[in-house]
Amino acid sequence: LRSPSSRSLNPWHFVVVTDKKLIEDLSQSKPHGAAFLKNAPLAIVVCADPQVSDVWIEDCSIAALNLHLAAADIGLGSCWIQIRERQYDQSLSSEAYVQKTLELKEGMRVEAIIAIGYPKEEKEGQPKASLLYERVSYEKFGQTK
């Protein structure tokens, strides 16, 4: 619950979900990229009050990344499910769907859902050759070392 935050305003709020029915409901929050959530034992919905900070999106993203790192540190797998700016269907946003499902207070925004559980497989790390060194500039944009 200690994550870097602009001006230490901490606009984020986490909704920890372990109820299987609620997790299944959340797994339907968008047509693609969320269905796997139904098999996870834990979902953490990363929300924020935008009245607290104008950079709530950035602060929530940092906090969510810390959740990923904490999960990995104790041997758990995690996966980000983007909610903000996604659609549940043609008439309802994923965010509105999650807000309704979790009965969030009015004005509370939803950034993402972090699925957490035991990974089915152990994936190898990325090879050093895949690092995108060309996306790093030194001193000025486009300048290589």
Where are these regions (language model features)?
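Acidic, surface-exposed loops and disordered segments
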Residues: 1-145
